[in-house]
């Protein structure tokens, strides 16, 4: 299978748009990279992250709120209730929430798109 960059390269404007997203959101921006990486691991159904996503001994409140939102975006939007939004607003600014939400949605979409192209390890709902 061709690399994801090779696939995007078939349409240079798409490759350029992805490069900008990578620089400004996926690998840059105002949200701590460690939080984004943790959310990406959750989306990839990393058992270590999923099994302990609400464990205060493993993750601080900011991380747990981000993981709860990741779950809501990816698998159960009903979890994005007033309580979750209150938790998110304690830990993140509005601009950070915009960036983190975009990161979660973009990463989830990329994982599913690449899986349809035959990439190994297609994500699914946490067990």
Cite the ranges covered by each PLM segment.
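Hydrophobic alpha-helical segments
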Residues: 1-127
């Amino acid at each position: 299978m061709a690399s994801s960059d090779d696939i995007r390269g078939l349409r240079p404007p798409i490759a350029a748009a992805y490069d900008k997203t990578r620089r400004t959101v996926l690998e840059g921006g105002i949200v701590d990279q460690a939080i984004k990486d943790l959310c990406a691991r959750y989306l990839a159904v990393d058992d270590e992250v999923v099994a302990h996503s609400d464990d205060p001994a493993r993750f601080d409140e900011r991380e747990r709120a981000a993981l709860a939102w990741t779950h809501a975006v990816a698998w159960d939007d009903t979890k994005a209730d007033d309580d979750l939004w209150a938790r998110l607003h304690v830990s993140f600014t509005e601009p950070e929430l915009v960036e983190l939400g975009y990161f979660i949605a973009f990463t989830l979409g990329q994982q599913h798109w690449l899986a349809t192209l035959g990439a190994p390890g297609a994500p699914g709902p946490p067990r």
